Amino acid sequence: MNVYGFNAKSITGEDTFLEDYKGKVILIVNTASKCGFTAQFEGLEKLYEKYKDQFVILGFPSNQFRGQDPGTNAEIQNFCLLNFGVSFPLFERVDVRGENSHPLFDYLTNAKPFKGFNLDDELESKFYNITKEEYPEFLDDDSIKWNFTKFLISKEGKVIERYDSWVTPEEIEKDIVKLL
């Protein structure tokens, strides 16, 4: 199986099939507009603009982590456009973990499980402590831990890599280029 079997509603409510992106490298990201990682939109947009002939970013807003994307779909779209010039495709807000998780995210997290926290890294250690305090049940599974988790997909629709929130778009660029 690959990601091409999934569909989702665009941020404007239109049915979108991931097979429409066949032949492009894809980066799927769960996003939020009120998160400490929200500034990553800038780096994501730069990557998209640089490689958009062969590459696409698909942004899926989620409100599951500290309620950091509470707006309507229109508000989310306007925020992304006005603050970061986001031109890559955005989708309706979805759950990315738990019993109401969008099937695409179930597939992605099964294909690339969570690698664990590197407690020697200051930022990862901080997120481990936040997770332990606020969402201890998250430590027991491979699901998404926070906003801006990213999944890199090959031109054939295969899940190649998972990058957690603290990995910046700039750090991912070399892996994207290898797949172009």
Task: Give short role names for the model-derived ranges.
Residues 23-26, 33-34, 38-61, 66, ...:
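Conserved helix-turn-beta segment immediately C-terminal to the redox Cys motif
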Residues 3-4, 26, 147-149:
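Short loop/turn microsegments at loop-to-beta-strand junctions
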Residues 79-81, 85-167:
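Thiol/selenol-based redox catalytic cores and closely related redox-interacting motifs
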Residues 54-72, 87-98:
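Thiol-based oxidoreductase modules, predominantly thioredoxin-like and allied folds used
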